[in-house]
């Protein structure tokens, strides 16, 4: 499990990105890069790092399911992810 502070930081960055999204789009469309540089650093969407929704693990993240490979495997074995079954050939 990730540190609680890292999970909280990721949520804070996501909120900041959402808060400044419209303003960033307007400034980029106008080409006002000086004003864009004055916005908070965390307002840029490139600062978002995807994390597992269950435990906050930052690595081995599967976008389609919003889980890390470890939690995906566990939930898939338990049959809790619809449409996912173990391969057999």
Curated annotation (Swiss-Prot):
Molecular function terms from GO: rRNA binding; structural constituent of ribosome
Record has RNA-binding as a keyword: yes
Alphabetic keyword roster: Ribonucleoprotein, Ribosomal protein, RNA-binding, rRNA-binding
Cystine pairings recorded for this chain: none
Pfam families xref list: Ribosomal_S14
NCBIfam families xref list: PRK08881.1 (NF006477)
Full protein name: Small ribosomal subunit protein uS14A
Protein species of origin: Levilactobacillus brevis (strain ATCC 367 / BCRC 12310 / CIP 105137 / JCM 1170 / LMG 11437 / NCIMB 947 / NCTC 947) (Lactobacillus brevis)
This protein's encoding gene: rpsN
